[in-house]
Regions:
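C-terminal catalytic/motor cores of large multi-domain enzyme assemblies
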Residues: 1-212
Length: 212
């Protein structure tokens, strides 16, 4: 499938702005549905299966100095329009500082010394990754879902593999790179300019080892 023309066509048909990120979320939900190994989690060294394809997107909510995450639950049950509406609503709340869970976490981080922040983040992330919710701290179950999607298109990087953040405990991270143009020879032997965009995967091999 030619992603860019496809998104343009779908946007015109449904009068909705579908981005590569939206396409990637839906694509990953389809892939994970076929390969259950990538949407489980590891609890105390033991692989546990998990219901539903939850996919996390990283969001820049400040002036480049604050990164938040928002997770779309059960993506396999939603169409692209539903995913778009939910993602846009979540991003709006984050950028307007109206997301209660994010505000609780940021308030806590402002109160603790810097040298404690790293270990505390790792502990909280692990608690979330094994399905424990702490409402008073704004900590949700499976905060980063089973896949993290990040877009580096705004940085002008055409090809890159992003490492999985240790705090995410996610099996997969998908990187959306910058669009670029190349001259290619078509089926008629003519030279034409086409737009390309690379989508690169980084995986945690342990999830696959547990299922082989």
């Amino acid at each position: 499938i030619k992603i860019i023309p496809y998104l343009k066509k779908k946007s015109e048909e449904l009068k909705e702005h579908f981005t590569p990120t939206i396409y990637a979320i839906k694509l990953m939900s389809i892939i994970m549905k076929k390969y259950p190994a990538v949407y489980g989690y590891i609890k105390f060294g033991i692989y546990e299966p998990k219901d539903g394809m939850d996919i996390c997107c990283l969001v820049n909510v400040g002036q480049g100095n604050e990164l938040a995450n928002t997770t779309i639950k059960n993506c396999e049950q939603k169409n692209m329009k539903e995913i778009t509406d939910e993602l846009m609503d979540n991003v709006k709340l984050l950028r307007e500082r109206k997301n209660k869970d994010q505000n609780k976490k940021m308030k806590l981080y402002r109160l603790i010394p810097t040298f404690i922040m790293g270990p505390m983040t790792q502990i909280f992330s692990y608690i979330s990754s094994i399905g424990i919710k702490v409402k008073s701290l704004g900590l949700k179950q499976f905060e980063f879902g089973s896949c993290v999607i990040t877009s580096i298109g705004g940085l002008g990087i055409e090809n890159s593999f992003v490492p999985i953040p240790p705090v995410s405990f996610a099996p997969v991270i998908l990187t959306l790179c910058s669009k670029y143009e190349r001259n290619i020879r078509n089926e008629k032997g003519e030279i034409e300019t086409k737009t390309f965009m690379k989508m690169n995967f980084t995986t945690d091999y342990r999830f696959f080892d547990y299922n082989t």
